Every structure is written in structure tokens, then in C-alpha cells.
């Protein structure tokens, strides 16, 4: 049995190793939750044996050593971290400790903020001008990242307004919105560059580039949450008041900052943010709760590495470790072969996860994944769980290589990978049962033809019994034939037939989307429908004509053109129309005749809207004569930026395109 000294030594060594990977190499090997668990275990042991605490223990300092490649900046006021709580009971205990330490039963109000998952930085302004910026580093000394911070558009190089202090050091978080993260990885996969495991790593890697020109290309953003140095000026005597003052001077502050009057209100804030988390557009891992009164903060003071007046209330972990038991290969509706990791089941963010996507062969190679490996699994919002990285330091001896198939696992046809594409595909087409099933599931889905009651299991049976080969065959089904399916009684069968009849009345855009043309999503389908107006005109369009549609480039235009050039596809469309599928005749909108500020303009929506859904906003803009595109280009006239707008906003600013916020959009819609 290990001695207490040995346990402490091993824990400290392990934590230092992972701190180095996290803070210095930007390549964490374990999830935050596992790091937190190890730190809690070390603290508990040191609490029981205080005589064994050493000055260099991870519990006695804030972060990790700065990278030698950067010059260093010593923080005039140490950048401390926060203590964590993980459940309501622990938060209420923290609340009680605060109340007990204050004199005369003073009322406490709480300033609650989002706990952003990025990189903590300090930014020093002298007479309102940005002069330096540094990472947290080890809490006393950080890396000089001034040149890189100056490239972040959200951070003002000069403050504006009145009564700006002679020296003001603001502290906050640099982070990368989800859209920007996806764009960076998409570009990296295309060019063979480094693919980041998560937005936090991407933000850290972007901010700590030795070449600021690379940082400038990354759509980083920033929210401030506190102050370090303050000289030659005054600030309000509440935390919220200070944040509002920062905002007046041009510093970005999250609009989710909330003042809570009681512990009950804090818990309500926590649960509301947890509910909204999937729609924020950027990663958070909890909320930060601070005593609002600066006077009370001073009374409460600090412990060795954290303030007594603040705490981070963390959400259930979105990353966990488990083992890969096998890798299987699924076939999608376009023939794409997707490797899927079969996992030892593990709870991630409150959901039991037993499968995770591996995307493609390149991703398996990048991860260095073998069957039997210990891996980190991430699940964020509604995103399909994915393997973040392999824990190489704990690789078992009996792992096996993952072998990508050369023949389709469903129909046996050759698997082909076109040069320049990451995805390998089955060449079997509609003779492949998997492709047929997935194509039909897409066709009847809610955003396509919206056939109520026709779920995946029904489609599986219809294909396996060879009742259905093409989408047109669905509309030939009878209640009698459906009754022969498993768990399908006469009433349910008739309901499906009725739903199919109802689905015949659709829109041109939905119909195009339902056909499952490669690279044609909802937005592109809507653009094609609006531009060409009728199926006959679209079918006859050349590749050059197709590229005139907003958001349609050479690749999409080629896929659309080739789809309609294929005789079997035209035959299926003819059958669908013969079965009664129809949509209203197009309403020709002449932008010149519409009195609207959006008429004739190509508009792009980015970020999340709070007052209406994206679909409703798109529909209203089209009614007013706009063309709504899915990406920003030189053809774009206007960008509407909601909360957490990412790479599209950055590109619009780079191209000098007009940008308005949701409030201005609503005002113009109303006018």
C-alpha cells in the first residue's frame, strides 16, 4: 500500500504534467473534469495532512510556466484563478460561508456571468491607449501577446468616453465562437494543416502564434470581466457598475451578465444558462458568481490562490474518458463511408454515450487511433459525440489497427476516394441498400417533405422487403401493404397513407432539398428555387447560370447540373409529379417595385437571433425582396449579425461590407 507521501508525489507529478500540456503546449490529454478530480483529490489529502504541503504543489499556484518563445510580462496584480463548485449543495455552502464572514448580516447581491472556455488575458491601457497584453501564465508572470491582441477586432486599441483612468488594466477571456472554430478546422483539413480538438485549443493556439498575421486571420473575440491595475481615475463601487462603465468606454462585455438578489436567483440563472448553452454559439463550462459590492469583496479577501468572494459553478462535464471497443463503418445517403467508434458506455453532459463519429480515414490517422485505446469523448449541445484525442500515455498493449474498408460493408461494391476529397464513398448507388435507406429517410424528414409518422424503422422495413426503391414508390404505398410491417396496425397504416397524401403539397425549395442533391442544403435549395422559379428552368440551367445564384460556386453548381443530367433522376422526378407532388406557382418578386431597404440586396444572417427564428427572418427578408445567402462574399450587400457572430462577421468586416445588428434589422423590417 502506498504511503501518503507517495500518493501526494504522484498526484503532484501527474497534475504538473497535465498543466504543462494544457497551458504551455495547448494540447491537453485529459478532460477538464478529470483534471478537476485529480486536483480535488490532492487538496483533500493536503487538508488532512497540512504538514506535507510543499510550496511548489499545484494547489499553491495558479497556472503553468510561460512559453520561452515569448517575452514575459510580470503582472502588477496577480491573476488568480477561482475555486469551483459542481452542484447546488456546494454553491449553497459557499453562499453560507460568504454570509457568515460578513459583519452585521449585510445583504449580499451577486453578479453572475458566463464562464467562457477560452484564454484569460490582461490588457493594459495608458491614457486610454492599449500598450500591452499578457496571458495569465503562472498568475504572476505571463507571456507578452500584445501584437496578437492588437489584431482582435473586438478589443479597442483606444478607449473612448470620459474620465478614462491614466492606467487601467482590464482582464477578460479571449475565445473563439463555434462558427469560427468550424471554419478554421475546415480550412485546415482542406490544406493539410493542424486540426484543433476544440474551440479552447484553437483560441489558445491562435493567440499564441509567433506571427501576428496568422492570429489576424482567426475570428477571435473577447469579453472583459474584471480589473487589475487602476491608477489616476475612479471606477464604480460595484462589480456590475464597473462592467457597465467598461462598456461605455468601448470594451466588450457579455450581455448575459445578470444581477441576482439571492442564492435562489443565482440557481435560476445557472439553470437558464445551462438550458441556453447549446444556442449561445460559443463554448462555456459554467457560470461565475461574484459578490457585487466591492466593499464586501474587500472584507472577504483572498485565500492563497483564489478570492473568497467569487466561485465558478461548473456544468456537468462535456468531456469524459472511456475505451474504444471497436470501429464500424456506416454508409450514408450519398455513399459516404463514415467510421464510428463503439465505446465503453460513459455519461457525458448527462447523456449515456456509446458511439462517437470518427469522420473519415484522415481523422483516424490524425488521432493515431487504435481499437482498444483510451480516448477523450466530447459532446457539446446537440452535436454528435466525437473523439477529441487518444490518451497515449495510457495505451493498452493489446490495441489493434483500424483498417478502412476497400469494399462497401453493406453491398460489397468498391469504395472510392476521389483525389482532393476527405470522404471515401461506396460506388454502388441505389443498388446499395444503405444508400437507398438514408436517401428515403432524408426525403421524408421534417425539413424536407415532412411525412409525419414515417420513422426510420418503417423505412428500413420498406427497403428490406423491397416495397420501395425510389422516393416515388412511397406515394404508391397502400394501407394494406403497410399493415404487413412490424408493429403497424390498420389505423397506424392509414395515418401514414394520409400523411403521404398531405406531403404531396409542398414548396419548390422543400422539394429540391428532399431530392438529396450533394452539397444542396436548405439555404441553397431556397436560393435555387427563388432564382429559377420553376423546375423546368432549373433543369435546363448550365453550370455558368447556376453559379449566378448567391452562395453557389463551381462545386455545388456541378453537383446540381450533374444530378439533373442523370436520366434516372429525371425519371424519379417525373414519377413524383405523376403521383401528385406539387407546389404553388412562383410569385415573381420585382425588387424594383418593392419599397424596402432590403429590396434587391444579397443578405447574410450570422449568429443567433433572440426575437425571431432564423427561418422566420429569412422568410421575411425574401418577402421584402432580399436574396438570402449562406456565406459572405464580394457579392454580399449586407450582413445581419446576431449574438456570437463568428467568421462571417469577421469576413464582412474584412471586405468592408455593411453590418447591422438584430435590433436594427427589426427596426427596418418594421419600417
Curated annotation (Swiss-Prot):
Residues noted as binding NAD(+) in the record, renumbered to the chain: 32-36, 81-82, 113, 136, 173, 290, 314
Q: What cofactors are annotated for this protein? A: Mg(2+); Mn(2+)
Enzyme class of the recorded protein, top EC level: ligase
Give the UniProt keywords, A-Z: DNA damage, DNA repair, DNA replication, Ligase, Magnesium, Manganese, Metal-binding, NAD, Zinc
Name the domain of life: Bacteria
Keyword Disulfide bond appears in the UniProt entry? no
Q: Where is the active site?
A: 115
Reaction equations catalysed? NAD(+) + (deoxyribonucleotide)n-3'-hydroxyl + 5'-phospho-(deoxyribonucleotide)m = (deoxyribonucleotide)n+m + AMP + beta-nicotinamide D-nucleotide
Q: Which PANTHER family match?
A: CHROMOSOME TRANSMISSION FIDELITY FACTOR 18 (PTHR23389), DNA LIGASE (PTHR23389:SF9)
Q: What protein name is recorded for this chain? A: DNA ligase
Organism encoding this protein = Shigella sonnei (strain Ss046)
Name of the gene encoding the protein in the UniProt record? ligA
Amino acid at each position: 500500500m502506498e504511503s501518503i507521501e507517495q500518493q501526494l508525489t504522484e498526484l503532484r507529478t501527474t497534475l504538473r504534467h497535465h498543466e504543462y500540456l494544457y497551458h504551455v503546449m495547448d494540447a491537453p490529454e485529459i478532460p477538464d473534469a478529470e483534471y478537476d478530480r485529480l486536483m480535488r483529490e490532492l487538496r483533500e489529502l493536503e487538508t488532512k495532512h497540512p504538514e506535507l504541503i510543499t510550496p511548489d504543489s499545484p494547489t499553491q499556484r495558479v497556472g503553468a510556466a510561460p512559453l520561452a518563445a515569448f517575452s514575459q510580462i510580470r503582472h502588477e496584480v496577480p491573476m488568480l484563478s477561482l475555486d469551483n463548485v459542481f452542484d447546488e449543495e456546494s454553491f449553497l455552502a459557499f453562499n453560507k460561508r460568504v454570509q457568515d464572514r460578513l459583519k452585521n448580516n449585510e445583504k449580499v447581491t451577486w453578479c453572475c456571468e458566463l464562464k467562457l472556455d477560452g484564454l484569460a488575458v490582461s490588457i493594459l491601457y495608458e491614457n486610454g491607449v492599449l500598450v500591452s497584453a499578457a496571458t495569465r501564465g503562472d498568475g504572476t508572470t505571463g507571456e507578452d501577446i500584445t501584437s496578437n491582441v492588437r489584431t482582435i477586432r473586438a478589443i479597442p486599441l483606444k478607449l473612448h468616453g470620459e474620465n478614462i483612468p491614466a492606467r487601467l488594466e482590464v482582464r477578460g477571456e479571449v475565445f473563439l465562437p463555434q462558427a469560427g472554430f468550424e471554419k478554421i478546422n475546415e480550412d485546415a483539413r482542406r490544406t493539410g494543416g493542424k486540426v484543433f480538438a476544440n474551440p479552447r485549443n484553437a483560441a489558445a493556439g491562435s493567440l499564441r502564434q509567433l506571427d501576428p498575421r496568422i492570429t489576424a486571420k482567426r475570428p477571435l473575440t473577447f469579453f472583459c470581466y474584471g480589473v487589475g491595475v487602476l491608477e489616476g481615475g475612479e471606477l464604480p463601487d460595484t462589480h456590475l457598475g464597473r462592467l457597465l462603465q467598461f462598456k461605455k468606454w468601448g470594451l466588450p462585455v457579455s450581455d448575459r451578465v445578470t444581477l441576482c438578489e439571492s442564492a435562489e436567483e443565482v440557481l435560476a440563472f445557472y439553470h437558464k444558462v445551462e438550458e441556453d448553452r447549446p444556442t449561445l454559439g460559443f463554448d462555456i463550462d459554467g457560470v461565475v458568481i461574484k459578490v457585487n459590492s466591492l466593499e464586501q469583496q474587500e472584507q472577504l479577501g483572498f485565500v492563497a490562490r483564489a478570492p473568497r468572494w467569487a466561485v465558478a459553478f461548473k456544468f456537468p462535464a462535456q468531456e469524459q474518458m472511456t475505451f474504444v471497443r471497436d470501429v464500424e463503418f456506416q454508409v450514408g445517403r450519398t455513399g459516404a463511408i463514415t467510421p464510428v467508434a463503439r465505446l465503453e458506455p460513459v455519461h457525458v453532459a448527462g447523456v449515456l454515450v456509446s458511439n462517437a463519429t470518427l469522420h473519415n480515414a484522415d481523422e483516424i490517422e490524425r488521432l493515431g487511433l487504435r481499437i482498444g485505446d483510451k480516448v477523450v469523448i466530447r459532446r457539446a449541445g446537440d452535436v454528435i459525440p466525437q473523439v477529441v484525442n487518444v490518451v497515449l500515455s495510457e495505451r493498452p498493449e493489446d490495441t489493434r489497427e483500424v483498417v478502412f474498408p476497400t469494399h462497401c460493408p453493406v453491398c460489397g461494391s468498391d469504395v472510392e476516394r476521389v483525389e482532393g476529397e476527405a470522404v471515401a464513398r461506396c460506388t454502388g448507388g441505389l443498388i446499395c441498400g444503405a444508400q437507398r435507406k438514408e436517401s428515403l429517410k432524408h426525403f421524408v424528414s421534417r425539413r424536407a417533405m415532412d411525412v409525419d409518422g414515417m420513422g426510420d424503422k418503417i423505412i428500413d422495413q420498406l427497403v428490406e422487403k423491397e416495397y420501395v426503391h425510389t422516393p416515388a414508390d412511397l406515394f404508391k404505398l397502400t394501407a394494406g401493404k403497410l399493415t404487413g410491417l412490424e408493429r403497424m396496425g390498420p389505423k397506424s397504416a392509414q395515418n401514414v397513407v394520409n400523411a403521404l397524401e398531405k406531403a404531396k403539397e409542398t414548396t419548390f425549395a422543400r422539394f429540391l432539398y428532399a431530392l438529396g442533391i450533394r452539397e444542396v442544403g436548405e439555404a441553397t435549395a431556397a436560393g435555387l428555387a427563388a432564382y429559377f422559379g420553376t423546375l423546368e428552368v432549373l433543369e435546363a440551367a448550365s453550370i455558368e447560370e447556376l453559379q449566378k445564384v448567391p452562395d453557389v460556386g463551381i462545386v455545388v453548381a456541378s453537383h446540381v447540373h450533374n444530378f439533373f443530367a442523370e436520366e434516372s433522376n429525371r425519371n424519379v422526378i417525373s414519377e413524383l409529379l405523376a403521383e401528385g407532388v406539387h407546389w404553388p406557382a412562383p410569385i415573381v418578386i420585382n425588387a424594383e417595385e418593392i419599397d424596402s431597404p432590403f429590396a434587391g440586396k444579397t443578405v447574410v444572417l450570422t449568429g443567433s437571433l433572440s426575437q425571431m427564428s432564423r427561418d422566420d427572418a429569412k422568410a421575411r427578408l425574401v418577402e421584402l425582396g432580399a436574396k438570402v445567402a449562406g456565406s459572405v462574399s464580394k457579392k454580399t450587400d449586407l450582413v445581419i449579425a446576431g449574438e456570437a457572430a463568428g467568421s462571417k462577421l469577421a469576413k464582412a468586416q474584412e471586405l468592408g461590407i455593411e453590418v447591422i445588428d438584430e435590433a436594427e434589422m427589426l427596426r427596418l423590417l418594421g419600417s
